[in-house]
């Protein structure tokens, strides 16, 4: 999913940010193409999810995996609502930067 997602955080008075690039893993190309129509809703939901996270939690591997699972569930929810099926198996973080 391009462009990469960027979220800003304020931690202990310091500005921090997260940048994450995502790939959707699915088996049916036609379903993935159909899901692209709903990309604005998917991106909005993911931005809201990412910006609502605790920065300190994201700095741990467990926190990153939990976020990946929540992001996967968010996209699957939109797919189920709009297309009547889950469509994607997983979202994969292909790049994850915290600063």
Regions found by a protein language model. Give the residues of each.
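Flexible, low-complexity charged segments
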Residues: 1-99
